């Protein structure tokens, strides 16, 4: 078994979220006509969830989770698999479980409030509101997905695996340093957020 197969695993994280937007060609043509412009010169999209935060909360958490995943792993192949050192995997998996639970909770909140969000958007969208822009709830919920896969590092067939031991050791050292750097950056960012929260709390208490 190759040394790298003993010291790392492959992980893949795919997160999808309903876009909650729709291109408004009718409005494009109207604006183009009023401005004496070609409709092809613009793209206008309606925010179907304007006025509420539920969908934005899901989007934000999904984006942060993707960045977190990228920050603790290294590229492996074009299929989306990334390399995670076994020394970090337990902590990685623990954090993953928390982030997935948060995603599921946010998505479930969105599911419960979807119709209410649509009514709120109706107030904001005015004359451009169209009931047909909003898919049935079941169809919308199919757009939300969190897929996580763990796989062993193959014995051969990849540059990292087939490298001679000396070159592989150099790659391994470089990877370890990169992972450590990313962890340090993430820790500093968490410290900044914690300090900011403490300052806000202190300010509120003083008021």
Regions found by a protein language model. Name each.
Residues 15-17, 148-152, 202:
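Surface-exposed beta-strand edges and flanking loops
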Residues 1-121:
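Leu/Val/Ala/Ile-rich N-terminal alpha-helices, chiefly Sec-type signal peptides and the beginnings
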Residues 201-207:
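Conserved small/polar residues in nucleotide/adenosyl-binding loops
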């Amino acid at each position: 078994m190759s040394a790298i197969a003993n010291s790392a695993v492959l992980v893949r994280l795919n997160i999808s979220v309903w876009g909650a937007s729709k291109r408004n060609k009718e409005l494009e043509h109207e604006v183009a006509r009023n401005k004496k412009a070609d409709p092809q010169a613009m793209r206008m999209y309606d925010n179907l969830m304007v006025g509420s935060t539920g969908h934005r909360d899901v989007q934000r958490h999904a984006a942060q989770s993707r960045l977190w995943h990228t920050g603790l792993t290294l590229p492996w192949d074009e299929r989306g698999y990334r390399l995670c050192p076994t020394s970090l995997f337990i902590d990685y998996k623990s954090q993953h479980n928390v982030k997935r639970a948060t995603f599921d909770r946010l998505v479930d909140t969105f599911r419960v409030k979807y119709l209410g969000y649509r009514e709120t958007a109706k107030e904001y969208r005015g004359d451009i509101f169209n009931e047909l822009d909003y898919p049935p709830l079941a169809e919308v919920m199919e757009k939300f997905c969190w897929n996580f896969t763990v796989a062993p590092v193959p014995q051969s067939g990849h540059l990292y695996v087939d490298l001679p031991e000396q070159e592989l050791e150099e790659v391994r050292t470089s990877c370890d340093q990169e992972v450590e750097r990313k962890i340090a950056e993430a820790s500093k960012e968490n410290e900044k957020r914690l300090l900011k929260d403490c300052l806000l709390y202190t300010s509120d208490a003083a008021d």
